[in-house]
A protein has these predicted regions:
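N-terminal "arm"/small-domain region of PLP-dependent enzymes with the aminotransferase-like
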Residues: 1-76, 87, 91, 174, ...
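Conserved core of the PLP fold type I
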Residues: 67-196
Length: 196
């Protein structure tokens, strides 16, 4: 009888982020104007569209296109791109990094899959570690990223009322516990478009 592995079952199940992306995809296929408030870039900025279009035209040069399409880069990524990213961080932030400090992934979901699984779960010494999210609510896409069960830990926030119909979440530092069971702390605030 045909079976799939536990991993296959995990990646094949319905997830919160999968449902969110399906909803967005369905909405984008319907006629009429759609205002995107999350699940991607909420704004199309004309000046950036023009920059991207110009860069795509540069790539369409036959020699560059042929190299990009038919030649493998190193497993770490395109050497010129790695160097450029490192130089950007050196110049912009004064960070002393090299190409060896740059990781290229297929996007943020893929990057967080690697990061969360590198720092959580069972370790060679027999310990088990978790990823700490200092407060929830948090980005729904993290919920199904880890391969092992029971690897995420979070705390309820303090709620600061800032007006009649508005509030902010704040980390409850009094409740926060960080000990040897925490492999990494993940701090993000993906609340498009406000950044709250």
């Amino acid at each position: 009888m045909f079976q799939i592995s536990s991993f296959g079952k995990k990646i094949g199940k319905v997830t919160g982020i999968g449902e969110l992306m399906n909803d967005i995809g369905d909405a984008m296929q319907k006629p009429g104007e759609v205002i995107l408030m999350g699940g991607g870039n909420p704004a199309k900025i004309q000046e950036m569209q023009e920059v991207f279009h110009s860069l795509l035209n540069e790539v369409s040069d036959l020699n560059r296109f042929s190299k990009i399409i038919s030649s493998y880069d190193s497993p770490q990524g395109n050497e010129d791109f790695l160097q450029d990213v490192a130089k950007y961080f050196q110049r912009t932030f004064g960070w002393n990094i090299t190409r060896n400090n740059v990781a290229i992934t297929n996007g943020s979901q893929n990057a967080f899959f690697y990061l969360l699984n590198m720092f959580s779960g069972k370790f060679p010494d027999g310990s088990k570690k978790k990823i700490l999210f200092p407060m929830v609510p948090e980005y729904i896409g993290y919920a199904d990223q880890t391969l092992e069960e029971d690897t995420l830990r979070s705390y309820l926030p303090k709620i600061e009322y800032t007006g009649k119909h508005s509030f902010k979440y704040r980390v409850d530092f009094d409740a926060l516990k960080i000990d040897e069971s925490i492999g990494a702390i993940c701090v993000t605030r993906p609340t498009n478009p406000t950044g709250n």
